[in-house]
Amino acid sequence: MQDFWQAAAAQLERELTPQQFKTWIKPLAPVAFDEETHALRIAAPNRFKLDWVKSQFSGRITALACEYWEAQVSVQFVLDPAASGRAAAYMQPAQPGMGPGGMDGHAAPGTGMGGYPGAQPMGGQAMGQPPFAMPGQQPGYGYGEPVSAAGYGMGQPPYGNPGNPGNPAGMPSAAPVPAGARGQPHPGQHGHQPHGADMGEIDVVQMDPAEASARSYRAPPQQPQQQPHQQMGGATPMPGHQPSDTVHERSRLNPILTFDNFVTGKANQLARAAAIQVANNPGKSYNPLYLYGGVGLGKTHLIHAIGNFMLLENPRARIRYIHAEQYVSDVVKAYQRKAFDEFKRYYHSLDLLLIDDIQFFSGKNRTQEEFFYAFEALIANRAQVIITSDTYPKEISGIDDRLISRFDSGLTVAIEPPELEMRVAILMKKAAAENVNVPEEVAFFVAKHLRSNVRELEGALRKILAFSNFHGKDITIEVTREALKDLLTVQNRQISVENIQKTCADFYNIKVADMYSKKRPANIARPRQIAMYLAKELTQKSLPEIGELFGGRDHTTVLHAVRKIADERSKDAQLNHELHVLEQTLKG
């Protein structure tokens, strides 16, 4: 059994990133193998790791076991808090020739399962806590929101059982915590044992070899981005510190959304740098951090990544992610139950508050008042506050001026729509995660036609993959064009050069007639060049046709304008934002 686990671990170490191997595979320990029933039992140290290993790696481990023992093997995952300690012993070199692998039941010297080299010793030290990294099966790629509604905490208030007679509002009785005491457990949490953590409890996953082979297992990228403390010089998490099995449920953080799977480009590099700085220095720099941008651009991904990193650094930290609508709902419930004292104690004692889409507070005066008090208390206690919105603070209507001034008091960072190269990179990564080879020219074709947000890109990719599978065709530009014909038709529908000229003239406050005139002042020539660029990008008109519609200009003039604006768009975030607004307006 030790030979098998060393060989399996060696193979998985080659397939996974170092952080993922240390986080998910190294803490596991084989418990027993029944030679009669071919049942293998593997222990995980806590429910959190058990659930993730079972959901992400059980198929691969089962396949390796079947290959090693040359039989149908079922894998049973056992919950055992002492597993991490025993795992180190199983990583020690084994005696040669003690495991199966041939007709005589002995492995060939120096070989492991499937003929690959036997495992080398990996050290006998107990596992420390590596940087937080989830298996890469559902990456967020820098853009996109939580993969499940549960990440928003909708319908799940942050406090306890409303039916508790000793606590009518169902809220905890935590008192405000001074700055010096942050990171201590909640009252009543000492000695807490996670549900289901009894020694010897078993969760069983059984698969035959066919199912194990059929079950998808996708190796993540081999060169992940570094964790924040590695980039910014923060301290490495202390050994033994790890999020408990219920900590993500309490915080409403989505563990899949991390810095590792956040794709960075010019459009979001400043926001990511600010997020990393905050993750390493919560409550000290950039407080509050205010991120704003359109839908599907990665705001929620970034704030979850901050929370997940801080949770790794200090699993006892009181962290709460909440959507603004749910915060409003919590205020209403507290009002109905006359439980504002408990409500305040909960929110005022957090170490990190992540609140999404703050624009939903518009017009809700009581909610704004309660949030103002919570904000003031958290800042006074040096807790970190992170806010997202779809617009700049001063542009939000229906929000109290004193709140707006608080939002502006920290760091405000915009996340812009991704540039062409970044959209291509996101599509290629998403395709790789699906184990599908998408030609680069196809990715460029899709990225060129779909610019609004990355959710739209991912939806288009799913349509292409489904169309290719259903029709048994390779993915080409022709197949892509056919798969996306409805989407592309909608993109180009009702967009005319005349409409583009009028929209640009209104946007830049010039006359439509200036689009055809020979005037060359900068305040006219620039909008005219932008309109030419959009006409080339959003219509099927040729360069000569566009030139004719702009006062009979030569096609070389149009080509110069298109190239000039395209080049400046890749370098100028403000221009990129303006073009994005114009494109969205034209597409309706």
UniProtKB/Swiss-Prot annotation:
Residues 469-588 are annotated as: Domain IV, binds dsDNA. It is found in: Cytoplasm. The keyword rRNA-binding does not apply. Pfam families: Bac_DnaA, Bac_DnaA_C, DnaA_N. Residues 118-140, 155-176, 183-196 have a biased composition (Low complexity). GO terms for cellular component: cytoplasm; plasma membrane. GO terms for biological process: DNA replication initiation; regulation of DNA replication. Residues 104-141, 154-198, 212-247 are annotated as: Disordered. Residues 73-251 are annotated as: Domain II. The keyword Nucleotide-binding applies. Keywords: ATP-binding, Cytoplasm, DNA replication, DNA-binding, Lipid-binding, Nucleotide-binding. Residues 1-73 are annotated as: Domain I, interacts with DnaA modulators. ATP binds at G296, G298, K299, T300. GO terms for molecular function: ATP binding; ATP hydrolysis activity; DNA replication origin binding; lipid binding. Residues 252-468 are annotated as: Domain III, AAA+ region. Oligomerizes as a right-handed, spiral filament on DNA at oriC. Plays an essential role in the initiation and regulation of chromosomal replication. ATP-DnaA binds to the origin of replication (oriC) to initiate formation of the DNA replication initiation complex once per cell cycle. Binds the DnaA box (a 9 base pair repeat at the origin) and separates the double-stranded (ds)DNA. Forms a right-handed helical filament on oriC DNA; dsDNA binds to the exterior of the filament while single-stranded (ss)DNA is stabiized in the filament's interior. Belongs to the DnaA family. HAMAP family: DnaA_bact. Domain I is involved in oligomerization and binding regulators, domain II is flexibile and of varying length in different bacteria, domain III forms the AAA+ region, while domain IV binds dsDNA. This is Chromosomal replication initiator protein DnaA.
